[in-house]
A protein has these predicted regions:
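N-terminal glycine/serine-rich phosphate-binding loop of ATP-dependent small-molecule kinases
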Residues: 1-93, 121, 147, 219-229
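Active-site core segments that coordinate phosphate-bearing ligands/cofactors
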Residues: 6-7, 19, 104, 111-123, ...
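Short beta-strand-loop/turn "lid" adjacent to the catalytic site in phosphate-handling enzymes
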Residues: 62-99, 123-130, 141, 159-180, ...
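A conserved helix-loop-beta module that forms one wall/lid of the active-site cleft
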Residues: 194-207
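Short glycine/proline- and acidic residue-enriched helix-loop micro-motifs
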Residues: 43-46, 116-126, 200
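Short, acidic/turn-prone active-site loops that include or flank metal/cofactor-
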Residues: 34-35, 96-103, 174, 258-260
Length: 334
């Protein structure tokens, strides 16, 4: 007899709902809903359209339950972005997109308080201005954190909107550049350097634990029972790394998407000057395994090209764009 679970996989350009059936030996996957993830621009700023994404998530949940009564739900997303909740549990504003320009130049300013080398040694995370830490510095300087009750990374935000439960899973927390590579806890000393209040940071929970069940309001709205929502690796890269069909303990992987991640799994983080110089990042995966990886630009340029074609009324598939590129007689970059 099959048992069913639902995976909600949200990337920076698209999302999907995958129904998994387990018969005791094999897991079979079925895509039941796919949707685009289109940011919204307003007043020169770029935001994630969380209300629309929630509508797509709920549509996927309903479509999957019509096929099979799944027992639990899990969510993963891209890294570094987050939502700020007010005391009444509502969003302070739509979550900012990591490609929003507000963090431009923030690294130079941050180095007045801590060097990039010291920051890497503390967190093991590649120092990039899009990281959660630097986004929160901008929020703190603008006064936005004054009205914030809690900060939730994106997978935990969606789980909260389904359950009402506040926590963050370890893998997604490790992308924030605010977790100590040595202790695995929020680095309070680092946060104090930038006057980021520790009170807004949620409890870090392990992958494989429960987030809770669908809230009564969600159950009533969608016509679903009290389905369990599990905390899995919230960062999509760590889900991919864990699922990679490696035959040995020592292996490398390449996870392709908007970003492509090239890396390997280790028992301990690599915090050396050489690793920092090579722009390697230490993230935490399932079972507290460390993933040492390199961020690569990935398919973002292709995705944006397709989006621009669509704006012009040309709805090319990725396969069609590939064919067009192969037929190009001047394969130069400009």
């Amino acid at each position: 007899m099959n048992r069913y679970v639902l995976a909600l996989d949200l990337g920076a350009s698209s999302g999907r709902a995958m129904l998994a059936a387990y018969d005791g030996e094999k897991i079979r996957l079925r895509e039941v809903h796919r949707f685009s993830n289109d940011p919204v621009a307003k007043d020169g700023r770029l935001y994630w359209n969380v209300p629309q994404l929630m509508r797509e998530i709920e549509q996927g949940m309903q479509a999957a339950y019509e096929i099979a009564p799944y027992e639990s739900i899990a969510i993963d997303t891209w890294g570094v972005d987050y939502g700020l909740l007010k005391a009444d549990g509502t969003l302070l504003e739509l979550p900012r997109h990591y490609r929003d320009s507000r963090t431009s130049g923030i690294l130079k300013k941050a180095e007045e308080s801590i060097t990039a080398a010291d920051l890497y040694a503390r967190t093991g995370t590649q120092v990039m201005e899009i990281n959660t830490l630097f986004q929160l510095i901008c929020d703190q300087e603008s006064g936005r954190l004054d009205d914030c009750e809690v900060m939730l990374p994106m997978p935990d935000l969606f789980a909260y909107l389904l359950t009402g439960t506040v926590s963050t899973e370890r893998s997604i927390a490790s992308t924030t550049q605010m977790v100590s590579a040595k202790t695995g806890t929020w680095d309070e000393e680092l946060l104090s350097l930038f006057h980021i209040p520790h009170r807004i940071l949620p409890e870090i929970v392990e992958s494989g634990t429960d987030k809770g069940t669908l809230s009564p309001a969600v159950q009533q709205r969608l016509g679903l029972p009290a389905i369990r929502v599990a905390a899995v690796c919230g960062h999509d890269t760590q889900c991919a790394a864990f699922a990679a069909p490696a035959k040995t303990e020592r292996h490398i992987f390449l996870s392709c998407g908007t970003w492509s991640l090239f890396g390997t799994e280790l028992e301990q983080p690599v915090l050396t000057e050489q690793a920092a110089a090579l722009a390697l990042s230490n993230e935490v995966g399932y079972g507290k395994k460390v993933t040492l990886l390199k961020n690569i630009i990935g398919l973002w340029l292709l995705q944006e090209s397709r989006r621009e074609y669509a704006r012009q009324g040309e709805n090319y598939s990725f396969a069609e764009i590939e064919t067009m590129a192969r037929q190009c007689h001047e394969p130069s970059c400009y």
